[in-house]
């Protein structure tokens, strides 16, 4: 199913933005179940549960249920991961402080760049503090870890940042 989601963008402008997005999802993991049937059952329950969620008026962007839920889960995972969680997640308070310091007196900025963007929490905090329309040319980031790079891209999509408004690269910032 994840490959079908990626393939749905083939031939469109967003093709490269979705390519490899779910590469790190291991649907054969024993953590999902000891047999293929049990793993499939859990995945079906998950996808059906997401499909049945009442997300309110998503089209008017009055809520950000997926994005907020994702951030919450990332926060919980990072805090449980201890020191290693800092490799991919900047705490919300730190992100907000950095954003406010970097944008003092500004109501609009050209772009936001994070050279070690992790899951994208700092990039998205700039959007929350200034507003999506105040960031004219989008969000840019680099992340060396492929798994974290994909987390960032998923995070952008879940926060309704269009594929044409962000450019996240899986690269070493220092090279």
Give short role names for the model-derived ranges.
Residues 1-106, 164-175:
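Non-catalytic, mostly N-terminal accessory regions of nucleic-acid modification and defense proteins
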């Amino acid at each position: 199913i994840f490959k079908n989601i990626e393939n749905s963008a083939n031939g469109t402008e967003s093709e490269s933005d979705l390519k490899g997005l779910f590469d790190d999802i291991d649907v054969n993991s024993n953590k999902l179940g000891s047999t293929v049937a049990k793993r499939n059952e859990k995945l079906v329950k998950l996808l059906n549960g997401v499909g049945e969620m009442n997300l309110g008026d998503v089209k008017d962007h009055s809520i950000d249920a997926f994005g907020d839920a994702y951030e919450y889960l990332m926060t919980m995972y990072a805090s449980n991961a201890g020191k290693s969680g800092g490799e991919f997640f900047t705490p919300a308070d730190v992100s907000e402080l950095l954003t406010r310091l970097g944008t003092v007196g500004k109501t609009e900025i050209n772009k936001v760049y994070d050279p070690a963007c992790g899951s994208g929490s700092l990039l998205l905090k700039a959007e929350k503090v200034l507003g999506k329309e105040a960031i004219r040319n989008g969000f840019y980031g680099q992340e060396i870890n492929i798994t974290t790079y994909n987390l960032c891209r998923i995070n952008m999509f879940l926060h309704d940042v269009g594929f044409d408004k962000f450019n996240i690269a899986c690269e070493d910032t220092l090279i």
